[in-house]
Each structure stands twice: as C-alpha cells, then as structure tokens.
C-alpha cells in the first residue's frame, strides 16, 4: 500500500477533512473517512440535518461558517449537488484546498488497496439511458458468473459497496459526480449520448460534455456514434482502446445491428450477440442501451451467451417506459424518468401515435429541436408545470395542428397570469390544500384521454424535472399511474 500512498494525498490518518452535504452521499463519505482514520467535520445548510449528526457524535458546522474557515481543512469531500460556482468550492479553490467528490474518494481508496484488491470499474454516463444500461451491464456480468456490484447514481454510493467482495463494479455516474472525480480511470467507460441538461449547474454545454468525457480516460472508451456530440468525444479520449456503437451495421472496432442481430466487431472479428427483437425496452433507445452494455461486458471478456441471457430476462425499471395500463385500446406509459428534452424525444419516437404529457422544469434546456423531430408522432399534447410555455411555443412552430391542453394551477409559479399561447385549451386546477401533484396529474390524464383514440399511447415523458409540482420523478410517475387507474376504473 505504501507505493499507492501518494494517490491519497492530502488524505492521511488524522487529517482534518470537511464533508460537504449531509445526505446519503455525506453519510457514506463520513463512514469511509472514519474507517480510514481521518478527522471529518460535516457541513450542511439544513439545521435539522446538522442536529441529527450532532446526536450521532459527528463534528458539524454550517456551510457558510465552513467556507469562512476553509483553510483549517486539508481536503473537502463534496456531495455532487455542490456546483463548482457555489461559495464553498470557490472558497476552497481560493485557499488552495483540494475538493474531491465521493466518487473521487472511492476511486483513490480502491486503487490504493484500502478495501483489498482493487476492483475493475465499468462506468456508464450520458444524458439519458444511464440506469437502464448500467442495470443491463450488471445483469450481463452476473449471468456470466462474474462477481459484480451495482452502484453509483443507481442504488448505493460506491463507497458503501467497496467493503463487499467483488471483481467488478457496474457504476452509473452523473455529470455532477464526474466533475468532482478528475483522477477516475475505469477499466471501461461509456458515454451514451450528450444533450442539453443541467446547464444551470455546469454553465455551458461544453463543460457538461467535458465532465461526461472523464469516463473515457481509462483502458476502454465506448461512445454512441449515432449521437454527434458523444461521437465527437471519441477522438480525444485518452483510452488506448476506442469503441463505438451504432444502430446501423458496425464497422471494424464497433458494435451495431446487422440482419436484426446485435453484432460485435470490436472485441471479435464478427460475433453475433442476440436478436434485436429480444430486447424488452421499446424503440431504438432500447437497442442502443443494450449495445452499450454489451460493449462494456465484452471489454471484460463476457461471452455472447450470458449477454443474450441477461437481455432476454431483463425488466425495465420503474418510471422508465413502464406500461401502467391498457384500456379501450389506449396504452398508458409512465416514462417520468425522461427529465430532459433528449430523453422525452427518445421516448416519444418509440410509439407510432402519442398523446404527450409534458412540462416541468427545463433547467435552461431548449426543447425546440426535439419537438421538431417528434412532431409527426404526436396526436395531442397536455402541458403541465412551470416551463410549459416553452413547450407550447415549440409545438406551435413545429406541430401547429396538434391539439394542446394546458393544465394551469394557482400555485404554478404565477402562470395563471401568463397569457395562454396560440389558443390552446386550458384546464384549471383548484388546489385547496390537498396534493397538488395528484390534482395536476388527474386533470392531465383526463385531458389526454379525451384526445386519445384506440391505438394511441398516452405517454408521460415530461422533458423536465418535477420539483415544481412533485417530490421527484418517482412521485410524478406514481401520480400518473394513480390518475390512470382512477380514470379507467
């Protein structure tokens, strides 16, 4: 371990370390630092959170006070929610105090042998499809009899699983986590796609893409070639092995589709993996997710048979293109996890005729190009949430014949006073102290049912975050499912 010690500097036994954020990530960081022998102090903006840690014997401080005394600490380990422009990271940078994320800490401790023989990390990132792809990858590794752990932005933090025996880690990472993990060098890393998202955190699309590209600095870089922004990252990847995947026929060094089969020409001359029609995730997005997962599995020598076995038995996660009901010839699909325009477009394109329930918080992203590409799939739209006007304006430009209904509430960020655009229908929701999200979704589903005909799909694929009207994307999806069940009863 002594040879690996420099990788841990400035972390050392007894070193004062500031842990920024007291959520799930913060708890995992505290446990790891205590195990290592460091002297952690936790900061958070929520007094109730701090009181809970004080009761557990943890030294605590407010975030503002921590920023004022930042030079007392040898290191800051931050939760991914802290943007680099937040006062605390800025104070650390000005004082020359390094800032790591929890993934950076996990990577350095693992490489240093702190948890035994280092694992081989297989990392998935991208604007959309991360969770499905990582879950597929883990299933492939498990089907091959390999000891794999699923972690990161899905399930448990990486730090929470490192004390479990494993050869491989199937890791989903967000752009926030990757920004704070500059030394990460995985065995294999995949960038599925790049679209406008989290620009309020990163500042620019270039900075967002640069964070995603960090997974390409290990041994094998895997990139979705059908996405121009992602494909552009392959030429600058540091990985010595570079692999692309596409929906079309693969060239040498790629995975793709030929004759209705997924084919590997990167890790074999010409290896058939599985039939496209065995992939349970609908539409092109399901094929792309399976190709990316297969590429990472193949980079650690998983044969074709367990890859096919894993896909055939794979089940889509909750709120990810989940069919919640079929009634009167209309299919109701919950894709509440489609929290940005790129994801919503992929979801809409999986079905031939769609009544689209959309809206929420766009986080600075434009929806115009995506609406233009999906316009011919839409037979109706029901718009909810704070940023629904932007969606409505895109629909008026690119799908002017598609009927649009606005669901308006008094609590909807003052949107009652906003002029209704282009003569759209309006459903007003009166919120009398009950569940606002449930009321909104009940009205949205009722409007969508009125627009839908047999053979249509009523699709919740919002293109925005949910926090204006819901506790999270899962809460939004549950509200949709409950509203559908009530409507078809």
Swiss-Prot record:
This is UDP-N-acetylmuramoylalanine--D-glutamate ligase. The keyword Kinase does not apply. It is found in: Cytoplasm. Keywords: ATP-binding, Cell cycle, Cell division, Cell shape, Cell wall biogenesis/degradation, Cytoplasm, Ligase, Nucleotide-binding, Peptidoglycan synthesis. The keyword Ligase applies. InterPro entries: Mur-like_cat_sf, Mur_ligase_C, Mur_ligase_C_dom_sf, Mur_ligase_cen, MurD. It comes from the Bacteria. Pfam families: Mur_ligase_C, Mur_ligase_M. Belongs to the MurCDEF family. ATP binds at residues 126-132. Coiled coil: none annotated. The gene is murD. Cell wall formation. Catalyzes the addition of glutamate to the nucleotide precursor UDP-N-acetylmuramoyl-L-alanine (UMA). SUPFAM superfamilies: MurCD N-terminal domain, MurD-like peptide ligases, catalytic domain, MurD-like peptide ligases, peptide-binding domain. One of its GO terms (biological process) is cell division. One of its GO terms (cellular component) is cytoplasm.
